[in-house]
């Protein structure tokens, strides 16, 4: 079985890769987006004829925006729904949003009919979720699960606890998930399996050694 890591170990690997080794976070985001795009092409259970990216305002959402651009530039029909406070958006998310604006990728809003889309990409939360999902995020997750579209999740299905695999109020039910370097331990728990679907583990250049080695 593929080795799994905790959420804290994942944070430490990210920190070492970006701040000690020196690979820029935006480079990692581009690599992640390309791998996710390739995973989606690989999964023949996904119909990519009309895709909606559900993007939070953090770096998980930024990964989703890279996927949106790659789909658009390869001729796929794709739209973006951004959920969350734009005033709290990460710098890398804002950079990807500007690129999507350049390519004039359509935006939709909370009242969009999800049933008209064939695939939804869950880029709402990463693995660091520590409290129950509420508000607009819970509304979007429940709406996505109730739709006829199939869902591909980025990093971990939004609403799952990365360490325990427990549902934090509500969670995306994906048919496939792209995660980087290692899966989180919670993703391999029995209770998480109905939510993760097929798991793709992608190498994007994250440091894969011992996160706790002596410097």
UniProtKB/Swiss-Prot annotation:
<dbReference type="InterPro" id="IPR036652">
    <property type="entry name" value="YjeF_N_dom_sf"/>
</dbReference>
<feature type="binding site">
    <location>
        <begin position="126"/>
        <end position="132"/>
    </location>
    <ligand>
        <name>(6S)-NADPHX</name>
    </ligand>
</feature>
<dbReference type="GO" id="GO:0052856">
    <property type="term" value="F:NAD(P)HX epimerase activity"/>
</dbReference>
<dbReference type="GO" id="GO:0000166">
    <property type="term" value="F:nucleotide binding"/>
</dbReference>
<comment type="similarity">
    <text>Belongs to the NnrE/AIBP family.</text>
</comment>
<keyword id="KW-0547">Nucleotide-binding</keyword>
<keyword id="KW-0520">NAD</keyword>
<keyword id="KW-0479">Metal-binding</keyword>
<feature type="binding site">
    <location>
        <position position="122"/>
    </location>
    <ligand>
        <name>K(+)</name>
    </ligand>
</feature>
<dbReference type="Pfam" id="PF03853">
    <property type="entry name" value="YjeF_N"/>
</dbReference>
<protein>
    <recommendedName>
        <fullName>NAD(P)H-hydrate epimerase</fullName>
        <ecNumber>5.1.99.6</ecNumber>
    </recommendedName>
</protein>
<feature type="binding site">
    <location>
        <position position="155"/>
    </location>
    <ligand>
        <name>(6S)-NADPHX</name>
    </ligand>
</feature>
<feature type="domain" description="YjeF N-terminal">
    <location>
        <begin position="10"/>
        <end position="212"/>
    </location>
</feature>
<keyword id="KW-0521">NADP</keyword>
<feature type="binding site">
    <location>
        <position position="60"/>
    </location>
    <ligand>
        <name>K(+)</name>
    </ligand>
</feature>
<dbReference type="InterPro" id="IPR004443">
    <property type="entry name" value="YjeF_N_dom"/>
</dbReference>
<comment type="function">
    <text>Catalyzes the epimerization of the S- and R-forms of NAD(P)HX, a damaged form of NAD(P)H that is a result of enzymatic or heat-dependent hydration. This is a prerequisite for the S-specific NAD(P)H-hydrate dehydratase to allow the repair of both epimers of NAD(P)HX.</text>
</comment>
<dbReference type="GO" id="GO:0046872">
    <property type="term" value="F:metal ion binding"/>
</dbReference>
<dbReference type="InterPro" id="IPR032976">
    <property type="entry name" value="YJEFN_prot_NAXE-like"/>
</dbReference>
<feature type="binding site">
    <location>
        <begin position="59"/>
        <end position="63"/>
    </location>
    <ligand>
        <name>(6S)-NADPHX</name>
    </ligand>
</feature>
<keyword id="KW-0630">Potassium</keyword>
<feature type="binding site">
    <location>
        <position position="158"/>
    </location>
    <ligand>
        <name>K(+)</name>
    </ligand>
</feature>
<keyword id="KW-0413">Isomerase</keyword>
């Amino acid at each position: 079985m593929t080795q799994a890591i905790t959420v804290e170990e994942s944070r430490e690997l990210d920190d070492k890769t970006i701040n000690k080794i020196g690979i820029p976070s935006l480079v990692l985001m581009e690599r992640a987006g390309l791998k996710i795009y390739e995973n989606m092409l690989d999964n023949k259970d996904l119909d990519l004829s009309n895709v909606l990216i559900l993007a939070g305002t953090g770096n998980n959402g930024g990964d989703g925006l890279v996927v949106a651009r790659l789909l658009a530039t390869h001729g796929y029909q794709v739209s973006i729904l951004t959920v969350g406070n734009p005033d709290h958006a990460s710098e890398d998310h804002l950079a990807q949003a500007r690129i999507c604006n350049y390519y004039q990728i359509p935006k939709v809003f909370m009242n969009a009919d999800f049933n008209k889309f064939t695939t939804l990409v869950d880029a709402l939360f990463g693995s660091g979720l520590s409290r129950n999902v509420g508000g607009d995020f819970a509304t979007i997750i429940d709406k996505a699960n109730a739709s006829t579209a199939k869902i591909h999740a980025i990093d971990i299905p939004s609403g799952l606890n990365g360490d325990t695999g427990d549902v934090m109020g509500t969670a995306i039910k994906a048919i496939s998930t792209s995660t980087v370097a290692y899966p989180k331990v919670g993703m391999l728990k029995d209770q998480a399996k109905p939510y993760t679907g097929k798991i793709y583990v992608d190498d994007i250049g994250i440091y894969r050694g011992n996160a706790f080695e002596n410097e």
